[in-house]
Every structure is written in structure tokens, then in C-alpha cells.
């Protein structure tokens, strides 16, 4: 009788542990996919601004965004591959709508809308990465998230001073 009870307790513990592992994997997958979607959004915005930006400031910012998010996208793709997580290859539908709206603008109207779009994406991105840091999950993903939090905080402070 005691053996049956012990076996049942072991099975229950394994089921609970398995459920916790599945939740962690789902959280990691969600984080990676959201972060990569944002990388693609910033790449697309940067490429558009390189073509349509009217000020040197916007064009330089766009070049920096494309370089940075190309590298971040590759880094995150490597982390995802190591964890067998599929990554999206495009921005979200919402971000594609923002891109399409900006594509219809020109001159200073484009520049101002671009700066606002970047600020909005950075705000979402910062919240995403902070959440991953606080989640205390996979060490590699947490390290990536922490590096993004630091970089975004610095970037947003600089943008606030300059714009």
C-alpha cells in the first residue's frame, strides 16, 4: 500500500514538474518570437527611413538601426536555434501597418512620424525585455534581454535629449 502511495506521489510530482517545464518553454518561445518580430519591425523602419528620411539625423539613425537590428536578429536567431524555437521572419501586422502609413509620408512629416514610431517600438521592446529579465528563465535569453534593456534605456535617454 505504501509503495502505491509513493508511486502516485512520484507520478504527481513528475506531472507538476513537466507542466512547469512546458510553461517555461512556452514563455521562452513567446519571448523569442516577440523579440524577433520587433527586430524585423525596426529593420523595416530603418530601411524605409534610409530611403525617405529628409534629415541627416534621421538617415544616420536609420543606418544605425539597420546595423544594430541586423546583428540582434542574427544573435537572437542563434539563441532560438539552440533552443529549437522557430522565429518569425517579418514584423507584426501592427508594425507593418505603421510601416505602410510612414511609406506614404515625406519630408519633415516622415521624419517626425518615424521618430514617434521608433519611440513607440522602443517602449514596447523595453517592456518585453524587462519582463524576460524579471522572469528569471533561461540564462542565455535573460542575458540577451538584459543587454537590450541597458541599450534601450541609454538610447531612449539620448533620443529624449536630442529630440
For the regions a protein language model found, what residue spans apply to each?
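His/Met- and acidic-residue-enriched segments that coordinate or traffic transition-metal cofactors
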Residues: 2-10, 17-163
Amino acid at each position: 500500500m505504501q509503495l502505491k502511495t509513493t508511486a502516485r506521489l512520484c507520478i504527481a510530482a513528475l506531472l507538476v514538474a513537466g507542466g512547469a517545464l512546458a510553461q517555461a518553454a512556452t514563455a521562452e518561445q513567446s519571448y523569442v518570437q516577440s523579440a524577433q518580430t520587433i527586430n524585423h519591425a525596426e529593420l523595416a523602419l530603418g530601411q524605409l527611413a534610409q530611403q525617405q528620411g529628409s534629415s541627416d539625423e534621421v538617415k544616420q539613425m536609420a543606418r544605425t538601426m539597420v546595423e544594430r537590428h541586423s546583428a540582434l536578429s542574427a544573435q537572437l536567431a542563434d539563441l532560438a536555434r539552440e533552443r529549437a524555437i522557430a522565429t518569425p521572419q517579418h514584423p507584426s501586422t501592427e508594425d507593418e501597418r505603421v510601416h505602410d502609413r510612414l511609406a506614404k509620408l515625406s519630408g519633415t512629416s516622415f521624419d517626425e512620424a518615424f521618430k514617434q514610431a521608433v519611440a513607440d517600438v522602443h517602449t514596447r521592446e523595453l517592456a518585453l525585455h524587462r519582463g524576460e529579465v524579471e522572469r528569471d528563465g533561461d540564462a542565455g535569453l535573460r542575458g540577451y534581454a538584459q543587454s537590450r534593456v541597458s541599450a534601450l534605456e541609454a538610447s531612449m535617454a539620448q533620443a529624449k535629449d536630442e529630440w
